[in-house]
Amino acid sequence: MLAEIEVNGRFDRDPDLYFLTVFGDPSLDSNWALRYEGHHLAYNWTFVSGVGIASSPQFFGSNPAEVRAGNKAGTRVLAAEEDLGRDLVSSLSGDQKGAAILDIDVPGDIFTAAEKEISPLENSGISYQDLDSRQKRMLIALIDELASMQPDVIAEARMETIRSEGLDDIKFVWIGGIETGDPHYFRVQGASFLIEYDNTQNNANHIHLVWRDFAGDFGRDLIRMHYQACLLYTSDAADEGLGVD
């Protein structure tokens, strides 16, 4: 379908061009990584012995976001994410919208693009603590929808981490129109994570959606913990005269 849309496009579109890559030696007692990616899809898992599993960056896209002609007309990809975000911003009061909706041009793509390492974006938007009880449930449902694109054990760990960090300061930002079909962007930013969603290209029918971890993309935080533990073990062993080289 995309090949038909992008006549004479820059790239050859082929549904078989998705690749699984293994880095390192997969085992329970080693550090290794697994990547599955292709156009509009990127999963990254880093397995760190004795520490845990990192699951970001995570990227999804769809062009078109909604099929508008032919026998698949009406089919939507990433529909739940778009609808949950729009339902939340539409539920806000006037004052709440003043905090959540930024009066700037809609970006042409997500702000973090394909950066290998990211930092928190501007601390703007409406806070979880400034939502009513129904809106709070809507925001958590939006976050959970993105977390649940992972296996259950990882999704549950993500949500547990987010709750343990505290929900009150999580920020929701919207840019653009709130009616269906309007070019729009939204993000959810917490202490350790960032969700960005953009639907502005191709007449607002082309989605980019990403989950990032400020410290843990590609397992950076887990690898750091692993090496700190190794250094501590080596130091303790040397102190005890165990002859560890």
Regions found by a protein language model. Name each.
Residues V244-D245:
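Hydrophobic alpha-helical segments, chiefly the membrane-spanning helices
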Residues I126-Q201:
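Extended, compositionally biased non-globular segments
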Residues M1-E117, L121-S124:
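Acidic/His-rich structured neighborhood in mature extracellular/periplasmic domains
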Residues M1, A157-L167, D213-L222:
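Short amphipathic alpha-helical linker/capping segments at the junctions of internal repeats
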Residues L28, W32-L41, W45-F47, I170-L232:
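Long, His/Glu/Asp-enriched segments that create or flank divalent metal/ion-associated functional microenvironments
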Residues L88, I126-S133, M138, D221-L232:
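Alpha/propeptide regions of enzymes that mature by internal proteolysis
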Residues Y233-A238:
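Conserved small/polar residues in nucleotide/adenosyl-binding loops
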Residues Q96-K97, S148, N203-A204:
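Short loop/beta submotifs within extracellular cysteine-rich repeat domains
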